[in-house]
Amino acid sequence: MNDRVFEQTMNQNHQGGAARECVLEAHGITKTFMQGGFNVQVLDNAQVSVRRGEKLAIVGASGSGKSTLLHVLGGLDEPSAGQVSLLGKPFTQLAERERNDLRNRALGFVYQFHHLLPEFTALDNVAMPLRIRRMSAEEARHHAREMLEQVGLGARAKHRPGELSGGERQRVAIARALVTKPACVLADEPTGNLDGSTADHVFHLMLELSRTLDTSFVIVTHDPDLAARCDRILRLRDGVLHEEPAVPV
């Protein structure tokens, strides 16, 4: 059974099961910017719900507001109207410190560029989120090493980013996002800088980790083939989110 057939089977099994808890919800999200003296509405009454272990793709034209939506979902940007809840807790009802603590505990982030610290090894880059949470260096490295093993890079733990390939660097970034065992990972064009075969491998890895760790993924992508491998697809057009029917892969 090849990777894509396996993914489709797992997606169908996931969708056919009982409804699972929502880990991330957004209701009535509107986002407006001032540009050239005019109000520009990027998001218009967007509704999003992400269930435990679900893989959700967000697609749309360049400049349609996909990254803005991801930043709002992650609590990195505030909506002009509407509400985002993470693990049932609305961001607007939390003090800034509580919101930051919740985000750091329950969310992971992966970007198109890996944002690894060049002077640190892969192991120490992955351990960094745990060290920020005041975990001891020994324990943080233990968990980081386990996560690197899960992304197939245990043998590269002592290498710095400059000594790794593009695909390896992105796998380290994925390990870093998952090392805190978040409920949901927000990924903004995570394969955008990779060649076709490497992108396919990294995307399959994310879907497999979502299944084994029961972690939700919200993935912004321009690639329709990759999006089709997720459980659901939302298209952002003119500020409005539309759910698209699943297409067999």
From Swiss-Prot:
Give an example GO biological process. lipoprotein localization to outer membrane
Q: Which GO terms describe its cellular component?
A: plasma membrane
Name the residues that bind ATP. G60, A61, S62, G63, S64, G65, K66, S67
Record's InterPro entries?
A: AAA+_ATPase, ABC_transporter-like_ATP-bd, ABC_transporter-like_CS, ABC_transpr_LolD-like, LolD_lipo_ATP-bd, MacB-like_ATP-bd, P-loop_NTPase
Q: Does the keyword Transferase apply?
A: no
Q: Which SUPFAM superfamilies match?
A: P-loop containing nucleoside triphosphate hydrolases (SSF52540)
Residue spans crossing the bilayer: none
Q: Write down what this protein is called.
A: Lipoprotein-releasing system ATP-binding protein LolD
